[in-house]
Swiss-Prot record:
Assembly: Homodimer.
UniProt-listed SUPFAM superfamilies: ATPase domain of HSP90 chaperone/DNA topoisomerase II/histidine kinase, HSP90 C-terminal domain, Ribosomal protein S5 domain 2-like
Annotated compartments: Cytoplasm
CDD domains: HATPase_Hsp90-like (cd16927)
Protein name: Chaperone protein HtpG
Region ranges (B): 340-559
Entry's family note: Belongs to the heat shock protein 90 family.
Gene3D superfamilies linked: 3.30.230.80, 3.40.50.11260, Heat shock protein 90, C-terminal domain (1.20.120.790), Histidine kinase-like ATPase, C-terminal domain (3.30.565.10)
Length: 632
């Protein structure tokens, strides 16, 4: 096929502009990204060769070679991995295939460190070569294709690229960067080695360069015809923990997670017994941009006897731990393992159980830290992944209690929206006569804090958890108790805050009896809007509030389901009125404006709990009429 000139996808043009103009001060990342791509190409070859050994083409020793040419002002990264066909070169180098391109650009912050990290996260690291090069030439041939089907891809990064078919004997990919003016400091063995050792020391493939020695006569370093390996070139997880420094763990995390920030914590151990495997797990310090996308692929890198099998092996972790990054290397799984086999394998189930327990232990260590730095780390973790962890209460019955101990909430104990109260903290502060853990759900912390349902709790000094995450109502349908004590909504059913003395009981019964004509008339007036109307003693400042019956769906959950486009049964609440409030005291069952007051009390209660009025215009009209009648 003759040479073709093709245009980059629009997003690639935008990306190239970003690379060249925005990331210059962090230019070293180009080598990190290209070495990472070469390592991935070797992993892919190993995987495909499991079923077709001929793909090695009598060259099974995989490596990456790095070289430079001062005269030509080029840097070359060469690998003997899987390589690319013509179609693959066009697809991989001319477009951003991954969904989420818009999210990528929306995430760019102008912070060069953060933006540089996103490049790897989105799989567009190849283009980082244009930070230092004004032209890139790629020569490649896919393993298994004839030498006549080699491909040359070339671009100056200005909107288009050329693709040509060439003769290429060796499989794999050779990338040549033609450096921009002013980049000659990169044409140094010492400089390139230092970048590799900084970013890619942990890559399990040997990275080779020609040895250099000092020539006394010439007074300069000269290249020898002998290779040297410039990185550690061993799978970090196979080494003993005592041989790995914290810095090496952090670098390895940044490699596997495509993240520029350090992890919050990690755990590394070998498991022996029914299943034999090594696990190296990390807790990131921030959530990936697409954590809540439907097509988000969580999971760990899976190796079998150090042979890469797949990225994102979701079967090794439950969904609620999808943010955990790392590697599992099994000694028992077959090398030809597929995603389907992973679903059914008994060995995988055992690994999943072990990995889950280890991940939870790591989080427990973070959560139980006594020092300020440790406490700060758990706060960081919770703000990034707390809502995801809450899913575990419903998803993981076996570990529900462990997950519950890791949960954090805002509460009336503090005066901020910080979610820093553990359920164990709440239990430790419970009143002697208190038998339940109380909570309120709302759309916002402000709405929860000011909920009329809290009035009597404040009066009696009883702490209430303020729950404002969308997942909370769903979670609570699985979390019925903690430490043997039931969880109770302050907006559901009859309220029992401890025994009343005889005088209090008698006074409440008398008040209820006196209010009966008003209550009955209100029930008749509001009709289908309410399930019941009753006198309450849970309010101190507000005239009314809405509560759900014990077995009914709450108004908050109904609103949440509707917002998600799901069908929800109609919310028929119980209207509770405060007999001590002046507005309620002034109600007369035979008054001309009684109906308007009934609807106003209902609408006010609905608004106070974050609900939406069915007919706002009538509410305004009714309110104005009542204000005018009072003013008159």
């Amino acid at each position: 096929m003759t040479q073709q000139t093709m245009s980059f996808q629009a997003e690639v043009k935008q990306l190239l502009h970003l690379m060249i103009h925005s990331l210059y001060s962090n230019k070293e990342i180009f080598l990190r990204e290209l070495v990472s791509n070469a390592s991935d190409a070797a992993d892919k070859l190993r995987f495909e060769a499991l079923e077709n050994n001929a793909l090695y083409e009598s060259d099974p020793n995989l490596r990456i070679r790095l070289s430079f040419d001062k005269a030509a002002r080029t840097i070359t990264i060469d690998d003997n991995g899987i390589g690319m066909s013509r179609d693959e070169a066009i697809a991989n180098l001319g477009t951003i295939a991954r969904s989420g391109t818009k999210e990528f650009f929306s995430k760019l912050s102008g912070d060069q460190q953060k933006d540089a990290a996103l490049i790897g996260q989105f799989g567009v690291g190849f283009y980082s070569g244009f930070i230092v090069a004004d032209r890139i030439t790629v020569e490649t041939r896919r393993a298994g294709l004839p030498a006549s089907e080699g491909v040359r891809w070339e671009s100056a990064g200005e909107g288009d690229f050329q693709v040509d078919t060439i003769e290429r004997a060796a499989r794999g990919t050779t990338i040549t960067l033609h450096l921009r003016e002013g980049e000659d400091e990169l044409l140094s063995s010492y400089r390139l080695k230092s970048i590799v050792q900084k970013y890619s020391d942990h890559v399990a493939l040997p990275i080779l360069m020609k040895k250099e020695e000092w020539d006394q006569e010439k007074g300069e370093m000269v290249e020898k015809d002998e290779d040297e390996t410039i990185n550690q070139a061993s799978a970090l997880w196979t080494r003993a923990k005592s041989e790995v420094t914290d810095e090496q763990y952090k670098q390895f995390y940044q490699h596997v997670a495509h993240d520029h920030q350090d992890p919050l914590a990690w755990t590394h151990n070998r498991v022996e017994g029914r299943s034999e495997y090594t696990q190296l797990l990390f807790v990131p310090s921030h959530a990936p941009f697409d954590l809540w996308n439907r097509d988000y692929r969580g999971g760990l890198k899976l190796y079998v006897k150090r042979v890469f099998i797949m990225d994102d092996a979701e079967q090794l972790l439950p969904q609620y731990l999808r943010f955990i990054k790392g590697v599992v290397d099994s000694s028992d799984l077959p090398l030809n393992v597929s995603r389907e086999i992973l679903q059914e394998s008994r060995d995988v189930k055992a690994i999943r159980e072990g990995v889950t327990k280890r991940a939870l232990s790591m989080l427990e260590e973070l959560a139980n830290a006594e020092d300020d730095a440790g406490k700060e780390k758990y706060k960081t973790f919770w703000s990034a992944f707390g809502q995801v962890l809450k899913e575990g209460v419903g998803e993981d019955h076996a570990n529900r209690e462990r997950v519950a101990k890791l949960l954090r909430f805002a509460s009336t104990h503090g005066d901020t929206d910080a979610q820093d109260v553990a359920l164990a903290d709440y239990v430790a502060r419970m009143k002697p006569e208190q038998t339940k853990l109380y909570y309120v759900t709302a759309d916002t912390w402000q709405a929860a804090k000011n909920s009329p349902h809290l009035e009597v709790f404040r009066k009696k000094g009883v702490e209430v958890l303020l729950l404002t995450d969308r997942v909370d109502e769903w979670m609570l349908s699985f979390l019925h108790e903690f430490d043997g004590k039931p969880l109770a909504s302050v907006a559901r059913g009859d309220l029992d805050l401890g025994a009343l003395n005889d005088d209090e009981k008698k006074a409440q019964e008398e008040t209820g009896e006196a209010m009966k004509p008003v209550v009955d008339k209100m029930k008749e007036t509001l009709g289908e809007k309410v399930k019941d109307v009753r006198v309450t003693f849970r309010l101190t400042d507000s005239p009314s509030c809405l509560v759900a019956d014990d077995n009914d769906m709450s108004g908050y959950l109904q609103r949440m389901l509707k917002a998600a486009g799901q069908s929800a049964p109609s919310f028929q609440p119980i209207l509770e009125i405060n007999p001590e409030h002046p507005l309620v005291k002034a109600l007369k069952a035979d008054g001309a404006d009684f109906g308007d007051w009934c609807h106003l009390l209902f609408d006010q209660a609905l608004l106070a709990e974050g609900g939406a009025l069915e007919d706002p215009a009538s509410f305004v009209k009714r309110t104005n009429a009542l204000l005018l009648s009072r003013a008159a």
